[in-house]
Amino acid sequence: MQIILLNDVDHLGEKGEVHEVADGYGRNYLIPQGLARVATDGAIRQLRDEQQQQARKEAAKKEQVEELKDELEDMQVVFTAKVGEDNRIFGTVTTQQIAVELSNRGFNIDRRDIELDEDIRFVGAYTASIDLGYGIEATLDIQVIPESG
């Protein structure tokens, strides 16, 4: 009998796949447990439609992430800091501070998705990599300038 998996099943397949299984396995275990349903022509058509709709949603989401990447890469974040000897700032600029600054500008980026190439301890220009998901990474320019006064 042909079935459509409603959940991932070990040693059989993943959710949404169509498989041929023994009648007893399908009727006595998979269907009663809610792991599968009988694969009728209508059910298979419905499954394909759902998969196409999901693929369109994923493509649209990925396109939004690409646009976000472009916006972030066109931006420069500037921090002012008190400076001591040798242009060394007091403290460091952290990923949390970067995330807050991006949030103030309307971007919802988690600090754990921001990776600094090096610790920001001196006045100057730095870059940070931001993992946006879907295998897309944005590079953010960061500038640290001395506090005036």
Swiss-Prot record:
PROSITE patterns: RIBOSOMAL_L9. Pfam families: Ribosomal_L9_C, Ribosomal_L9_N. GO terms for molecular function: rRNA binding; structural constituent of ribosome. The keyword Plastid does not apply. InterPro entries: Ribosomal_bL9 (IPR000244), Ribosomal_bL9/RNase_H1_N (IPR009027), Ribosomal_bL9_bac/chp (IPR020594), Ribosomal_bL9_C (IPR020069), Ribosomal_bL9_C_sf (IPR036791), Ribosomal_bL9_N (IPR020070), Ribosomal_bL9_N_sf (IPR036935). One of its GO terms (biological process) is translation. Keywords: Ribonucleoprotein, Ribosomal protein, RNA-binding, rRNA-binding. One of its GO terms (cellular component) is ribonucleoprotein complex. Belongs to the bacterial ribosomal protein bL9 family. Binds to the 23S rRNA. This is Large ribosomal subunit protein bL9. It comes from Salinibacter ruber (strain DSM 13855 / M31).
